[in-house]
């Protein structure tokens, strides 16, 4: 993809990020899918879906042909984007509770590439207080942090996302308004709410 990406999706070769990237690219955005899974990256860039996602195969080939979507393992590619959407996998401990330490620590890596005008969107389902911890990590570089959780059945995101209301909250007005404007391109209804800390 030669054009700069409007959107970078971290965890973009996973179930949540891949479908979201296809949806945004179909609305005219340039999307980079950033992920560590080299096998999925290779499949996506060759036009093959890495797992079952309804209505995705034809759409992926079309978006690649139009040069609106590509996958990479280079985190620094976020520099090219306005929006950074984070939906990386959250491991579960032996008591089946989410282990968010790795998720939180990831933002120290991301911070190296942040600019003050980035809009960072957390898509993961997280516990109260996590947004505040992340904000403390990144605020010296970027204060525009929003929380827009996904609520999609795996494998049916392309069908469901446009029909479901999207919750939008954040740490400042710019993050909230810009995130709402972005998701309004792909969702019928936006519901603004507060981050619970």
Where are these regions (language model features)?
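Alpha-helix C-terminal capping/helix-to-coil transition sites in glycosyltransferase folds
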Residues: 79-80, 116, 163
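Internal alpha-helical scaffold of NAD(P)-dependent oxidoreductase catalytic cores
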Residues: 132-147, 152, 158-197
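N-terminal glycine-rich dinucleotide-binding loop that anchors FAD/FMN and/or NAD(P) in oxidoreductases
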Residues: 49-69
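Short acidic low-complexity segments
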Residues: 65-81
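NAD(P)+-binding Rossmann beta1-loop-alpha1 motif at the extreme N-terminus of oxidoreductases
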Residues: 1-48
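Glycine-rich, N-terminal phosphate-binding loop of Rossmann-like dinucleotide-binding domains
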Residues: 86-89, 124, 171
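Rossmann-like NAD(P)(H) cofactor-binding subdomain of soluble oxidoreductases
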Residues: 91-154
């Amino acid at each position: 993809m030669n054009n700069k990406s409007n959107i970078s999706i971290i965890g973009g070769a996973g179930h949540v990020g891949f479908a979201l990237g296809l949806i945004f690219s179909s609305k005219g955005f340039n999307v980079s899918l950033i992920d560590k899974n080299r096998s999925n990256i290779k499949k996506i860039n060759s036009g093959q879906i890495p797992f079952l996602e309804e209505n995705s195969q034809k759409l992926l080939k079309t978006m690649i042909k139009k040069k609106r979507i590509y996958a990479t393992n280079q985190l620094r590619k976020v520099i090219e984007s306005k929006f950074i959407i984070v939906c990386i996998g959250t491991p579960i401990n032996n008591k089946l509770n989410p282990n968010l330490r790795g998720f939180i620590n990831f933002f120290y890596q991301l911070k190296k590439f942040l600019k003050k005008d980035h809009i960072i969107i957390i898509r993961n389902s997280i516990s109260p207080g996590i947004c505040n911890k992340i904000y403390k990590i990144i605020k010296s570089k970027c204060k525009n942090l929003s929380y827009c959780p996904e609520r999609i059945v795996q494998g049916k995101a392309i069908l469901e996302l446009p029909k479901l209301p999207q919750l939008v909250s954040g740490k400042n007005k710019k993050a909230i308004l810009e995130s709402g404007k972005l998701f309004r391109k792909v969702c019928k209804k936006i519901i603004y709410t507060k981050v619970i800390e």
